[in-house]
From Swiss-Prot:
One of its GO terms (biological process) is one-carbon metabolic process. InterPro entries: ADOMET_SYNTHASE_CS, S-AdoMet_synt_C, S-AdoMet_synt_central, S-AdoMet_synt_N, S-AdoMet_synthetase, S-AdoMet_synthetase_sfam. L-methionine binds at residues 63, 107, 259, 290. Belongs to the AdoMet synthase family. ATP binds at residues 22, 184-186, 250-251, 259, 265-266, 282, 286. The gene is metK. It comes from Roseiflexus castenholzii (strain DSM 13941 / HLO8). K(+) binds at residue 50. This is S-adenosylmethionine synthase. It catalyses: L-methionine + ATP + H2O = S-adenosyl-L-methionine + phosphate + diphosphate.
Length: 405
């Protein structure tokens, strides 16, 4: 999002979310459920787990290094699918009868030698363990974090509302309030902004898989009244707000029967709905030595604390890494003209108050725990309903004092 966003008197921005039964999200959840199982068995396990699904089939592949022991991967896969709600063959996909293929092998020793012991430690005997993290970055790349004061959770409003709709659809389905709903679905929200502030909801789009015997009129009525009006504040809706509910007119065939799915294909849904940049690396199925995940979490932690401290109203941070090297290669920030102190000061304060080496991130955010399965649906950020330590604003007051605010 450029600084022109803050200067425009009228601008529209759209973000989407998907429900937990979307084929790509099935794969994300399976990958993270497998990751959690390995971390429960061995907190230092190295895991890179990818999943694919299509009609009647789940395929789990990847690389794992862990203390030996039995991990019942097929059982984990079936339980995850059942928890999502694919429990009936009439849906075209169900936990009890789908095929499960598993092809997981050991991690490359070439990668492991760099991750196990960072370049700074391996190459210089004079450097002490206290000065550098012992864990090098698991790959090269750049990661972004973002926060803004549009919502209490310091997330962009379009993606926040899209996720709320998705969670509400899931709750009403699982509680039996709208029993004709099935697991697959999508939501999309368009917000009208004026000079960088959200002023109204322009458009809401909801598509949800359903039983064949329900009318489109009933679906539209129920979703508008029991979903949209329950999660979107009334003061954001007006007579010009447009509602699209299952605009194709029918959504009976869905889930893996309708579309194949893959881990890592919903990275914008997982993050900020397109309001911020993305480094390209997906999260699910990756243990915290993979900076695609852990550094992106740390960047969100930094960004949320910067905004909570009042240093800026909108804030984006980029960090970059080299494989096997612990220290970030670069840190850059963008405040979109909303900063209360110079950006150079903010970079200095970040360096003073946050250690962005992978080992330090894992330590400070307690990332070796099996906490990842719940993150794999309805966004990794802005969550207060799951264990997400990167959402804490524990350093905001220290940043505020250090900035003299």
């Amino acid at each position: 999002m450029s600084t022109s966003f803050m200067k425009s008197p009228r601008l529209f921005f759209t973000s989407e979310s998907v429900t937990e039964g979307h084929p790509d999200k099935i794969c994300d959840q399976v990958s993270d459920a497998v990751l959690d199982a390995f971390l429960s068995h061995d907190p230092r396990a190295r895991v890179a787990c990818e999943t694919a699904t299509t009609t009647g089939l789940i395929v789990v592949i990847g690389e794992v290094t862990y203390e030996q022991g039995y991990i019942p991967i097929e059982e984990i896969v079936r339980k995850t699918i059942k928890d999502i709600g694919y429990t009936d063959a009439a849906y075209g996909f169900d936990a009890d009868t789908c095929g499960v293929m598993v092809a997981i092998h050991g991690q490359s020793p070439d990668i492991a030698q760099g991750v196990n012991r960072a370049l700074e430690v391996r190459s210089d005997g004079q450097v002490t363990e206290e000065e550098v993290a012992t864990i090098g970055a698991g790959d090269q790349g750049m990661m972004f974090g973002f926060a803004c004061n549009e919502t209490p959770e310091l997330m962009p409003l379009p993606i926040a509302l899209a996720h709320r709709i998705g969670r509400r659809l899931s709750r009403l389905r699982k509680d039996g309030v709208l029993p004709y709903l099935r697991p697959d679905g999508k939501s999309q929200v368009t917000i009208e902004y004026s000079y960088g502030r959200p002023v109204r909801v322009d458009t809401v789009l909801v598509s949800n898989q359903h039983a064949p015997d329900v009318t489109q009129e009933q679906i539209r009525h129920d979703i508008i009244h029991h979903v949209i009006h329950e999660v979107i504040p009334n003061d954001l809706l007006d007579e010009k707000t447009k509602y699209f509910v299952n605009p194709t007119g029918r959504f009976v065939i869905g889930g893996p029967m309708g579309d194949s799915g893959l881990t890592g294909r919903k990275i914008i849904v997982d993050t900020y709905g397109g309001m911020a940049r993305h480094g390209g690396g997906a999260f699910s199925g990756k243990d915290p030595t993979k900076v695609d995940r852990s550094a992106a979490y740390a960047c969100r932690w930094v960004a949320k604390n910067v905004v909570a401290a009042g240093l800026a109203d909108r804030f984006e941070i980029q960090v970059s890494y080299a494989i096997g090297v612990a220290r970030p290669l670069s840190i850059s920030v963008e405040c979109f003209g909303t900063n209360k102190v110079p950006e150079e000061t903010i970079v200095r304060l970040i360096d003073e108050h946050f250690d962005l080496r992978p080992g330090a991130i894992i330590r400070d955010l307690r990332l070796r725990r099996p906490i990842y399965r719940p993150t794999a649906a309805y966004g990794h950020f802005g969550r207060d309903d799951i264990d997400a330590p990167w959402e804490q604003t524990d350093r905001a007051e220290a940043l505020r004092r250090a900035a003299g605010l």
